[in-house]
């Protein structure tokens, strides 16, 4: 797989944009999670209105070779509704926090979706036949008078227009006191974990009424609380290993073979802080917003406010690679603290071969880093460059007084336009980028 673009590498070009163009965006329409399935043929998004929209990849067409990166709506359903916790007098919003696909075992697809409190397992299946010729029912479903039935009929299957159904198969509720921030499916395909601010639970996909608490960092006295869990993920190949990150910038790797309760970690990853750069904001910007294992399982990647770090699982003392995402914002931390942007939770993702990584920034910019060449590129998700197959031009941010023609000044960045959620196709150079209520799909340019 090629690098991130620029130089002798391939270039990224526009494929599609989904969503309305309206200037006034309804809060419910803001995309809150993006996820490709294991084959990359399906792409799911969740939004703040509790809806899940699934897009299906178009089959490659010899007469339209550029359509290989096109996705069209496959299924839309309401996953979660707003609820009210009468015990705590709290509203539970319907926003979808995470979506995770299960590996496909048969013709149907399964995914997990979660809001702050409840996880649901959905089955997405196709129907293109219907049964006709029941003995006790008419074709429109009404019961027939038994005394008028004079012959025995054998029901037959008749073809019908393709219908995609989404049905909830399991509902996993009442296991989290705090807001769920992560779900991760295990490589055993039977269990998954869910994490909130203070606890991580292990579930079996077939059992909804109980889960095992595998991490609990809640202190006896809540005044002694110094950190919270920010993200958690299972290892892609070893079903006994998982990691979780904290608001203190640390990552703990746990092995469930050691003990049932994994409060004692097997490995502890932390980068020593440079005392000379310490400031009031140091702890806030070191909080990890996302952690992802590489597809190979050898590395993991963490995202904090200003950077992306790649860690070798065999080296706990410091990351092996550090990439600055928007270092030019370091001088703006005070104003970012005042407008609460400093608490934004950016996600990150690997490409299929682990050779490149992607994460979001402000002004609808997103960044890509090539791990082999150490080159990086800044691109923009914008309708201005949304002509079919339009090549994305690299963007540059300048901090000084003199600005070149193609540069944007750091003071001109729009902090309301932010790319928090991105996804990379598991095998191809196709990426999905969520920008407020719009989903942009880009692909590498076909020569």
Curated annotation (Swiss-Prot):
The WD repeats are found at 26-65, 91-132, 175-213, 224-264, 283-321, 338-379, 414-447
Quote the subcellular location field of this record.
Cytoplasm
Give the GO terms filed under biological process for this record: cell division; exit from mitosis; mitotic cell cycle; regulation of chromosome segregation
The family database entries (PROSITE patterns) matched by this protein are listed as:
PR55_1, PR55_2
Q: Name one GO molecular function term.
A: enzyme-substrate adaptor activity
Q: Keywords on this record?
A: Cell cycle, Cell division, Cytoplasm, Mitosis, Repeat, WD repeat
A GO cellular component entry from the record: cytoplasm
Q: SUPFAM superfamilies annotated for this entry?
A: WD40 repeat-like
Record's superkingdom? Answer: Eukaryota
Q: Which SMART domains match?
A: WD40
How it assembles, according to the record, is: PP2A consists of a common heterodimeric core enzyme, composed of a 36 kDa catalytic subunit (subunit C) and a 65 kDa constant regulatory subunit (PR65 or subunit A), that associates with a variety of regulatory subunits. Proteins that associate with the core dimer include three families of regulatory subunits B (the R2/B/PR55/B55, R3/B''/PR72/PR130/PR59 and R5/B'/B56 families), the 48 kDa variable regulatory subunit, viral proteins, and cell signaling molecules. Interacts with ensa (when phosphorylated at 'Ser-67') and arpp19 (when phosphorylated at 'Ser-67'), leading to inhibit PP2A activity.
Similarity comment: Belongs to the phosphatase 2A regulatory subunit B family.
Q: What does this protein do?
A: Substrate-recognition subunit of protein phosphatase 2A (PP2A) that plays a key role in cell cycle by controlling mitosis entry and exit. The activity of PP2A complexes containing ppp2r2d (PR55-delta) fluctuate during the cell cycle: the activity is high in interphase and low in mitosis. During mitosis, activity of PP2A is inhibited via interaction with phosphorylated ensa and arpp19 inhibitors. PP2A complexes containing ppp2r2d (PR55-delta) also regulate the activity of TGF-beta/Activin/Nodal signaling by restricting receptor activity.
Protein name as annotated: Serine/threonine-protein phosphatase 2A 55 kDa regulatory subunit B delta isoform
Source species taxonomy: Eukaryota, Metazoa, Chordata, Craniata, Vertebrata
Q: Which gene encodes it?
A: ppp2r2d
């Amino acid at each position: 797989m090629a690098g991130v673009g620029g130089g002798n590498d391939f270039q990224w070009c526009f494929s599609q944009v989904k969503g309305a163009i309206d200037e006034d965006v309804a809060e419910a329409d803001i995309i809150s999670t993006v996820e490709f399935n294991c084959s990359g043929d399906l792409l799911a998004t969740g939004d703040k209105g509790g809806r899940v929209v699934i897009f299906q990849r178009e089959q490659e067409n010899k007469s339209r070779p550029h359509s290989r990166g096109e996705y069209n709506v496959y299924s839309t359903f309401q996953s979660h509704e707003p609820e009210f916790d009468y015990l705590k007098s709290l509203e539970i919003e319907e926003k979808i926090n995470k979506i995770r696909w299960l590996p496909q075992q048969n013709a149907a697809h399964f995914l997990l979706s979660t809001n702050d409190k409840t996880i649901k397992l959905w089955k997405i299946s196709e129907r293109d036949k219907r049964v006709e010729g029941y003995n006790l029912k008419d074709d429109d479903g009404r019961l027939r008078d038994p005394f008028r039935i004079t012959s025995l009929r054998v029901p037959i299957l008749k073809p019908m227009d393709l219908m995609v159904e989404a049905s909830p198969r399991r509902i996993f509720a009442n296991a989290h006191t705090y807001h769920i921030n992560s779900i991760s499916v295990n490589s055993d395909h039977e269990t998954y974990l869910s994490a909130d601010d203070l606890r991580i639970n292990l579930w079996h996909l077939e059992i909804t009424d109980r889960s095992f608490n595998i991490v609990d960092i809640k202190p006896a006295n809540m005044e002694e609380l110094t950190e919270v869990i920010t993200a958690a993920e299972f290892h892609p190949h070893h079903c006994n290993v998982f990691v979780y990150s904290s608001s203190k910038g640390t990552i703990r790797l746990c092995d469930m073979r050691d003990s049932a309760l994994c409060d004692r970690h097997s490995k502890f990853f932390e980068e020593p802080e440079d005392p000379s750069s310490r400031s009031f904001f140091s702890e806030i910007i070191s909080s990890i917003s996302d952690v992802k294992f590489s597809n190979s399982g050898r590395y993991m990647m963490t995202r904090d406010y200003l950077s992306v770090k790649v860690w070798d699982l065999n080296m706990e003392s410091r990351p092996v690679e550090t990439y600055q995402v928007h270092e030019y914002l370091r001088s703006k931390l005070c104003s970012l603290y005042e407008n609460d942007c400093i608490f934004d939770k950016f996600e990150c993702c690997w490409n299929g071969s682990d050779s490149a990584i992607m994460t979001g920034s402000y002004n609808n910019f997103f960044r890509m880093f090539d791990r082999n060449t150490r080159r990086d590129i800044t691109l923009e998700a914008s309708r201005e460059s949304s002509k079919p197959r339009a090549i994305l031009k690299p963007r540059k941010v300048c901090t000084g007084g003199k600005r070149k023609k193609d540069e944007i000044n750091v003071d001109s960045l729009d902090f309301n336009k932010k790319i928090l959620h991105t996804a990379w196709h598991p095998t191809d150079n196709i990426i999905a980028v969520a920008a407020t209520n719009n989903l942009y799909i880009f692909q590498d340019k076909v020569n």
